[in-house]
Amino acid sequence: MESTPSFLKGTPTWEKTAPENGIVRQEPGSPPRDGLHHGPLCLGEPAPFWRGVLSTPDSWLPPGFPQGPKDMLPLVEGEGPQNGERKVNWLGSKEGLRWKEAMLTHPLAFCGPACPPRCGPLMPEHSGGHLKSDPVAFRPWHCPFLLETKILERAPFWVPTCLPPYLVSGLPPEHPCDWPLTPHPWVYSGGQPKVPSAFSLGSKGFYYKDPSIPRLAKEPLAAAEPGLFGLNSGGHLQRAGEAERPSLHQRDGEMGAGRQQNPCPLFLGQPDTVPWTSWPACPPGLVHTLGNVWAGPGDGNLGYQLGPPATPRCPSPEPPVTQRGCCSSYPPTKGGGLGPCGKCQEGLEGGASGASEPSEEVNKASGPRACPPSHHTKLKKTWLTRHSEQFECPRGCPEVEERPVARLRALKRAGSPEVQGAMGSPAPKRPPDPFPGTAEQGAGGWQEVRDTSIGNKDVDSGQHDEQKGPQDGQASLQDPGLQDIPCLALPAKLAQCQSCAQAAGEGGGHACHSQQVRRSPLGGELQQEEDTATNSSSEEGPGSGPDSRLSTGLAKHLLSGLGDRLCRLLRREREALAWAQREGQGPAVTEDSPGIPRCCSRCHHGLFNTHWRCPRCSHRLCVACGRVAGTGRAREKAGFQEQSAEECTQEAGHAACSLMLTQFVSSQALAELSTAMHQVWVKFDIRGHCPCQADARVWAPGDAGQQKESTQKTPPTPQPSCNGDTHRTKSIKEETPDSAETPAEDRAGRGPLPCPSLCELLASTAVKLCLGHERIHMAFAPVTPALPSDDRITNILDSIIAQVVERKIQEKALGPGLRAGPGLRKGLGLPLSPVRPRLPPPGALLWLQEPQPCPRRGFHLFQEHWRQGQPVLVSGIQRTLQGNLWGTEALGALGGQVQALSPLGPPQPSSLGSTTFWEGFSWPELRPKSDEGSVLLLHRALGDEDTSRVENLAASLPLPEYCALHGKLNLASYLPPGLALRPLEPQLWAAYGVSPHRGHLGTKNLCVEVADLVSILVHADTPLPAWHRAQKDFLSGLDGEGLWSPGSQVSTVWHVFRAQDAQRIRRFLQMVCPAGAGALEPGAPGSCYLDAGLRRRLREEWGVSCWTLLQAPGEAVLVPAGAPHQVQGLVSTVSVTQHFLSPETSALSAQLCHQGPSLPPDCHLLYAQMDWAVFQAVKVAVGTLQEAK
């Protein structure tokens, strides 16, 4: 006997003698035995083959093929029982093969006909029915559970693959049934791509998804190789027997170069009069999913359109029956179940031919439970039982799996929204119960209901595949570079995820490599992810579209900005409930009414959760007003009669005793959300400033030791020197955030700060002053919290130095004009070369060249500047704006309200019509005569009749995660649609230009917006030639130098102040403006414009400077809430403004709403729901981070 081939060395030789394996030889020329059934082979039928190493003389290999040794190769020494491996006490008494854990070989094809053409099938051991005591024997590659063992993971090499005879050239005619070993070009034994194991899907067969392999249901037929699909030269389908058979077989598993056409057609064509044998729907190498690739009638998929189910004609003398795949070669039944095969089809022959049998009985017979149990199913059941938790297999094994009809009925009874998706109708966009934590939900109610309107579609992948079956044919479309196999199938050197590690008996939680390891489509080599920018775009990058899912990076950003506020709200809730209990009030009643106004009837503040309401009307009181009204509750109960139902009106008032304590969300749900949020904080190292996070160890019971070690590790104190080393400043900047968050007991353990000389003290103090509050950029005393070990003299010197250098730091940080940042080069010149962005110096503005910047660069830079309260200029919007929608010809037909704006007062309505306004828009000589000290404006809200403009605006908005109504970082997207969102609708503003000699006028007076604002300049008139010189002189006289460059069409000038300077500006306006003109109320129209002289006085006398932004057509200016700003149009312009609610300014917006008494009712209704929007956003963020690995 020849030696074992090189590609078989080191592989386990699983061989048994013929009696052990249940192989019964068949003499040549003997007639077939009774009881043989063709079609898909049942898992219990005997077969003499495993991995190409045979023990019988009449092997399936061609003559002369090297045979393996007779003795069985022992297992690897030192390997104990692992997941899926054999148990000696269980398998010791069983006949047949002994099992070792098997893994999928990528991408081996376990599909093939049970009896190829002119093949003499193997004889089973028994001629009767399917006995349960049959020993285990397998036909090559018909069983998807005998796979390559883990021993083959040691080193990559060519793995022998068994191919059907019609794909191998040179097969001898005396062995027409042989399935020779052939090196498969796609097979590798290194790290395997992540494929859900065959054992995890139960009776649905194995599930394989590989984007590099052509798909049967969606890919066109022309994309495949004609020789592989059994096509002739003309591209038409070829029937069996029309092509010549191969004539040469190469030794050592090498394929001949002159391979003939494939005689087995891949797809079944139209029925023919010539009888032919049914063949598999995909050859080896095209592995598909039994449950969701085959298309049914009406699906429109290619797999069904190519031909109807055919009735094959097998060499067996039995009558033909309809084949239904039990292996991956055959399509399942329409209901998604698997049909009978082999011996299991014996009992269905009579029932399948009769047409009068009920369909339910046919479904029962053709379901996956029709196969009687055997030794192999016991093996599979045990394996599934062990791994049911890992692979989320319901109830452990397929024998107890419910049929699809019963499962749908159960879901329908339970009110599951998946029934609608399975039956074909779309699920509702917003569930009927959007308020979690009601009495019906109980524990865990905060995360049971997910708001689908904000793109939070949480679908369990395991249940999704199990329930939808063949209707979810596109569920396997994922990133072609990510691995698709479970962690247990990875090489031993790679770490496993937490669930896989626990299943293997290991401890600790490891991050799964499925999100970090990529593979080449055909090479089969694993490589570590190196492009962090590409990887972060899917995890941390912003999502676009109303139905996109919240990414991990955005969830962290939401939680870091809103978590502290939610903690304060929850603490206020606990205090309110504790006070109500002390007052003797009953338990709070949970109310579930989405349309009720969440506003206090007395102070018009927002209602978060706990409040008092009248059970007979809509009268409600917040916590503060409820306490005031509850002081006389005891007196009312003692001496006064309670209010009757007839007297319950708004005019008559409500007695305190008639109000009832009410909640929108139960206290239990809020407590669970608070616990989950703090655990996510600890898990992702998100820093919070709430008192609850002072000791984070209480929120992480399993990681108490690690948290203790992390709190003990403090950064070393930098050693200052007198030589002015720049590295010292850098180290202090990097370590200051960490040291500022350390607990007091850890700071006390540090030694005294080394300050041996006055020079070192001055240097360290100056650095601390420059690292003051980010939003203020000014010195303050004391600069840092006093340390227990600090000397009193050191604190006094810090205060003195802070007072001396405070004004200089202010002037440097709040310098006038537009400073050169990473996106600018001297004003409005050309942008800088594309280099890695760096954090700009304090006071510099950000100019984004792209409306949707890269997640790792421009987007994070915007968040940094936006967090500091700075405006941002965005260019490049003109590429998406449609000029025909925003021109004067298109806008002239629209109506609008014309207003006259003066420098000292709010805009006043004008008697001019919109047609007259648009006639003088581009021609000053045609403009109506008006006061020299006023400018005409036109305002219009874009409503339903402006659908095309609204859609174009939505597609052109910069940073849609913030500015768009469905943006994940826009808190308005977490509120239900209604009248409350009306203040956020886009507004159209058109204004005449201000001539250079009228610099004291503006097109928008100084005002403060309650919400964040984005203003896009959609159209600007061309300035006259005589204005260029005057315009240049006017721009050169603005604050700062180099703000204007020749060639750029500057249309508007923005002056933006910091929100912290609003109070100083109010006091300055009260001094320089007439009575009533200096008011700067939030949300009210501006009543004063600051010209160059007033801005200079404000800077010199009050130390308040402003940023100057020059806006051109196709650019947008983003202004944070609370920042005073004014606009001056140099030419006639048309702009569109839209408000949004960002997490960074949500707290300031709520505060400004209470300070603005002149806000319209719609604005009060919007900002009254800010706390509820914060709750919804935090709930979605916590749910996303809990599911993240």
From Swiss-Prot:
It is linked to Alopecia universalis congenita: A rare disorder characterized by loss of hair from the entire body. No hair are present in hair follicles on skin biopsy. Atrichia with papular lesions: An autosomal recessive disease characterized by papillary lesions over most of the body and almost complete absence of hair. This is Lysine-specific demethylase hairless. Fe cation binds at C1007, E1009, H1125. Contains two Leu-Xaa-Xaa-Leu-Leu (LXXLL) motifs. The LXXLL motifs are essential for the association with nuclear receptors. The keyword Metal-binding applies. It comes from the Eukaryota. One of its GO terms (molecular function) is histone H3K9 demethylase activity. The keyword Oxidoreductase applies. PROSITE patterns: JMJC. SUPFAM superfamilies: Clavaminate synthase-like (SSF51197). It comes from Homo sapiens (Human). It catalyses: N(6),N(6)-dimethyl-L-lysyl(9)-[histone H3] + 2 2-oxoglutarate + 2 O2 = L-lysyl(9)-[histone H3] + 2 formaldehyde + 2 succinate + 2 CO2. A motif (LXXLL motif 1) lies at residues 566-570. Its EC number is 1.14.11.65.
